[in-house]
């Protein structure tokens, strides 16, 4: 499986950070939000950010922007679609419904949630849709934090999960770990434990 284009839905701190990190690796990204104005402002924040999110300001050309109503067709060509919207299950479920109706067959769909169990995120998906669905929990700031948690579900195509892990390690420079669906995933659990020690 090759990842040659990515769509990110949600252009807040995490969506923007993931977009910047992908474009640093020369992966074309489309950043979608409720309005093109919101995603355009996010692209401008990426360009001006301190510390810099981009390794080279010219990399910004790898990021296109749009909105989830007029520009959603880009999902049909994407190899990986990342959901990075607000942590509300009802909103995430609506986004997934729209993604799975429009994505190309076999495209990976992932959530950047930091705490919602994958069982809840995927409860309304078909078994076939679950094969291509996982959590990709990037840490903020994405460019500077090496850890990436990939949380799998019981229906995943494990070869696809392994391909995604290798892409994130080799192309994005992440220390990717594959986790089971446990509360808070691994990174948050270790963080809470460390604060208590």
Residue ranges: model-predicted function:
Residues 2-5, 60, 78, 106:
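Phosphate-coordination loops involved in phosphoryl transfer and adenosine-cofactor binding
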Residues 28-78, 88-90, 94:
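Conserved N-terminal Rossmann-fold NAD(P) cofactor-binding segment
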Residues 27, 102, 127-129, 147-182, ...:
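Internal alpha-helical scaffold of NAD(P)-dependent oxidoreductase catalytic cores
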Residues 19-24, 58-80, 163-173, 179-184:
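Amphipathic alpha-helical segments at domain termini/boundaries
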Residues 22, 43-54, 82, 100-103, ...:
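Structural signal for hydrophobic packing residues in well-ordered secondary-structure cores
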Residues 80, 85-148:
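Rossmann-like NAD(P)(H) cofactor-binding subdomain of soluble oxidoreductases
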Residues 1-49, 102:
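NAD(P)+-binding Rossmann beta1-loop-alpha1 motif at the extreme N-terminus of oxidoreductases
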Residues 9, 17, 32, 66, ...:
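Structural motif
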């Amino acid at each position: 499986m090759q990842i040659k284009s990515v769509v990110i839905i949600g252009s807040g701190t995490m969506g923007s950070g993931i977009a910047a990190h992908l474009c640093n690796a020369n992966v074309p990204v489309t950043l979608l939000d409720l309005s093109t104005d919101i995603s355009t402002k996010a692209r401008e924040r990426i360009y001006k950010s301190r510390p810099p999110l981009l390794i080279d300001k010219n990399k910004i050309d790898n990021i296109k922007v749009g909105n989830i109503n007029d520009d959603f067709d880009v999902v049909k060509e994407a190899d990986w679609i990342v959901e990075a919207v607000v942590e509300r299950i009802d909103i995430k479920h609506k986004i997934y419904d729209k993604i799975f109706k429009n994505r190309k067959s076999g495209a990976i769909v992932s959530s950047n949630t930091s705490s919602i169990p994958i069982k809840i995120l995927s409860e309304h998906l078909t078994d076939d849709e679950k094969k291509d669905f996982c959590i990709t929990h990037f840490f903020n700031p994405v460019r500077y934090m090496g850890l990436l948690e990939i949380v799998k579900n019981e229906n995943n195509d494990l070869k696809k999960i392994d391909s995604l892990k290798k892409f994130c390690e080799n192309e994005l420079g992440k220390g990717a770990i594959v986790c089971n669906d446990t509360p808070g995933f691994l990174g948050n659990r270790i963080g809470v434990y460390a604060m208590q020690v």
